[in-house]
């Protein structure tokens, strides 16, 4: 994939999610075309009713494919980074776990999403959360300053995933960790799916093979790598693209890895 194709993908993703941000809710993106509420969708992914009720209205947009909070093991005082933070849902939940002495940074490349998240933070009175405009391949975050990175159904949208993992490694402190929910491929995607931009911006066509994800993480320097597919996710992925064969190839997974302490 050349740089022109990279830019075309970024432009399509930015346009798609800008429209979702302005629509005030779940749109034809990772959640698919659906009339189901964002809270209901999130609870099906493992969030509790209490969690979906805790955040400001408009923060939960129903765009995830899992619950990275469940594997992040966040602690009071930690610095947490959310890759592709959207309306701020996971950031606000993380903020409650890390407390006033901690700090949460959300990075998103879509100006409308960053604006929405900042508005939501003001509505909720969050003082330990900030949102920065930037690409997850080139994070606006200093070296070695983050304890934990979370992300929910975003990295599959990147046209340069090795760069995403390399930059994640850069910003993590020694001993820092990744706790990600994302869509991965368990079989090679056919060309007709890979070339479908709607399926790409819908979090399916850009999925990397599980073995490729593991290799990218290893190359970046990570250890204790674990990619755990969630076969039950096929039921909601099927709803993202009715009438297609995407569930013959992709599944949601949790992705965990550690930056060595020394």
Regions of interest found by a model, annotated:
Residues 162-177:
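A short glycine-rich, Lys/Arg-flanked "PGG" loop and its adjoining helix->strand segment in the class I
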Residues 185-204:
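Short, glycine-/aromatic-enriched active-site segment of Class I SAM-dependent methyltransferases
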Residues 80, 149-150:
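Hydrophobic beta-strand segment of the Class I
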Residues 33-79, 83, 89-97:
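Conserved alpha-helix/loop element of class I SAM-dependent methyltransferases that forms part
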Residues 76, 137-148:
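A short acidic, Gly/Pro-enriched loop at the edge of an enzyme's catalytic core
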Residues 18-25, 31-32, 216-262:
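C-terminal lobe and adjacent flexible extensions of AdoMet/dcAdoMet transferase-like proteins
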